[in-house]
C-alpha cells in the first residue's frame, strides 16, 4: 500500500479491497458506485459487485496520487490482476458524506 495521506474512508476502502463485508462499512447506506458505466445502488448491491469482482479479477490496487476535483477526491491508482491490460491506471472519484463514501466512480 502506498504512503499517501488518504482520508479515512478512502484508506479503509483500499485496505479492505478483498473483503466485501468490510468494504460495505466504508459506504453510506444509500451509496452509489459506478464501475465503467455499471451502476450499483445501496450497500447490498455494492457488496455483491465487489465480492464478484474480487473473486473474478484478484485485483490489487495501489493508490499513487490524490487530488481534489470539485466536491470529490480523485485517486489515481495502479491496478494489477487477472484481466486484459494488467497492470493499468484507473481513476477513483470518491464523494464523501459524514465520514463515509456516498459515491464512487471508477474509470480508466
Predicted regions and their residues:
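C-terminal and inter-domain tail/linker signature
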Residues: 1-108
Amino acid at each position: 500500500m502506498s504512503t499517501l495521506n488518504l482520508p479515512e474512508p478512502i484508506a479503509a476502502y483500499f485496505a479492505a479491497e478483498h473483503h466485501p463485508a468490510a468494504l460495505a462499512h466504508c459506504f453510506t447506506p444509500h451509496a452509489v458506485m459506478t464501475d465503467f458505466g455499471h451502476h450499483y445502488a445501496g450497500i447490498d448491491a455494492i457488496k455483491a459487485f465487489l465480492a464478484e469482482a474480487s473473486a473474478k479479477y484478484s485485483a490489487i490496487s495501489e493508490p499513487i496520487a490524490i487530488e481534489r476535483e470539485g466536491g470529490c477526491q480523485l485517486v489515481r491508482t495502479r491496478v494489477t490482476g487477472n484481466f486484459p491490460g494488467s497492470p493499468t491506471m484507473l481513476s477513483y472519484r470518491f464523494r464523501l458524506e459524514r465520514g463515509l463514501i456516498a459515491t464512487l466512480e471508477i474509470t480508466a
